Amino acid sequence: MPEELKVPRLVTVAEKRAMEEDFHMSSARDTGQLLRTLAASKPGGRLLEIGTGVGVGAGWLLDGMDPAARLITLEVHPEAAQISKEMLASDSRVEVVQANAVDWLRAYDGPLFDLIFVDASVPKYEERALTLSRIAPGGLFVCDDVIWSAAWDPQVRPSKDRVDKFRAEIHGEPDFHVSLLDWGPGICVATRITADAGH
């Protein structure tokens, strides 16, 4: 079976639930495949997802993770968090936390993360420094929606100014090697290259 057709069952179920809930912010399948690949590069890793939605992105991450890896996924909206807890309850490697991501990141004092996937605006834009400070040396910062589209709903998607500012600034992060992938919704992948993670 071609790799592009290997969609995890959990992702299929979560995508169906997203349609039922009229939720249109889930990770696209090409983004999901990249998440799975990157998760597989972190055996025994500590992963963080910011913006669970109803569990589509988490499903892809879990499919790439080995048995020793662990995922914390944060969702600010109580209803979506509850759906995700139900969707992901069968996998002991994941913990769904209903919380404001910025507040959670500020309070977090545990080990640094080997991969952080950000699918929420404030931790990606205004509070990016806080998010990056929680990444271990060699760890990955991944986010999507870095190519602005006029088709985006301004009520739920970032403005063109925010996206353009992100693209202009991200290559200036001194402790990271950065790649912007201009396919799908636009993907940023950055790797921490220094041992000083500010933690």
Segments predicted by a language model, with ranges:
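A short alpha-helical cap/connector motif
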Residues: 1-115, 122-142, 146-199
